[in-house]
Curated annotation (Swiss-Prot):
Keywords: Endoplasmic reticulum, Membrane, Nucleus, Transmembrane, Transmembrane helix. It is found in: Endoplasmic reticulum membrane; Nucleus membrane. Heterodimer with ALG13 to form a functional enzyme. This is UDP-N-acetylglucosamine transferase subunit ALG14. InterPro entries: Oligosacch_biosynth_Alg14.
Length: 230
């Protein structure tokens, strides 16, 4: 089989997988046999953090300022290609704990951006599929082959923008399959005072905890108002 045909069949198979997952999410309830891994309150918990660039990264940095780094380890920071601001934020976050935190306790994972500001619809669809493909490999397939019993992280915290929707969808695959899965926490942006963002509306049905910072933004089901968090 030629390389071109191989790539074509691979893209087709991946597209069918994506459609199957979307149909499962739309028409069926999550598997009742799926489960989050249980651990005592003082046990270690691996953490995934998405840094969405700009104001999203600044808010996430503030959210993590009170994190118990001894418990939540190892930490995986997920960011988009070329996002130097988020890389500097990781350095600031980790160095804020001084020499108490080992550099071996965190990892960096770079993904292509799902959508850029002002990007046309057609090219957005292509970039979303590219991000979904790479995220599925790195966050689902490779961890599954290494250890089928464990998700890539125990807990994933996201706060936008669009690329985090892809991360949540990929993280949800294990739940659909009835495997131990990643808990998902979404924190709506401080800027969303009266309504949810588009990313928030898409993630709300899938998140284990969906937090907003303003009372007027909590009029939807499964939304928790916790006050100002950043």
């Amino acid at each position: 089989m030629s390389l071109g045909r191989y790539i074509g069949w691979s893209i087709l198979a991946f597209t069918y997988l994506v459609l199957a997952i979307l149909l499962r999410l739309i028409f069926l309830q999550p598997s009742k046999t799926s489960r989050a891994s249980y651990r005592p309150k003082d046990a270690k918990c691996s953490l995934g953090v998405f840094l969405g660039s700009g104001g999203h990264t600044s808010e996430m940095k503030a959210l993590l300022s009170t994190l118990d780094y001894e418990r939540y380890q190892p930490r995986t920071y997920i960011y988009c290609h070329g996002d130097d601001l988020s890389l500097r934020a990781v350095s600031d976050i980790e160095s804020s704990k001084g020499g108490l935190i080992s550099s071996k306790m965190y990892y960096l994972l770079s993904l292509p951006r799902a959508r850029r500001v002002g990007q046309p619809l057609l090219s957005t669809m292509v970039s979303v599929l590219k991000t979904l493909y790479i995220a599925a490999l790195r966050l689902f397939l490779i961890p599954l082959l290494k250890n089928p019993r464990r998700p890539f992280v125990d807990l994933l915290i996201v706060n936008g923008p669009g690329t985090c929707v892809v991360l949540v969808l990929v993280s949800y695959i294990r739940r659909i399959l009835g495997l131990e899965y990643t808990r998902i926490i979404y924190v709506e942006s401080f800027a969303r005072v009266k309504s949810l963002s588009l990313s928030g509306k898409m993630i709300r049905p899938l998140a284990d905890r969906f937090l907003v910072q303003w009372p007027d933004a909590s009029d939807s089901d499964n939304v928790i108002h916790k006050g100002l968090l950043v």
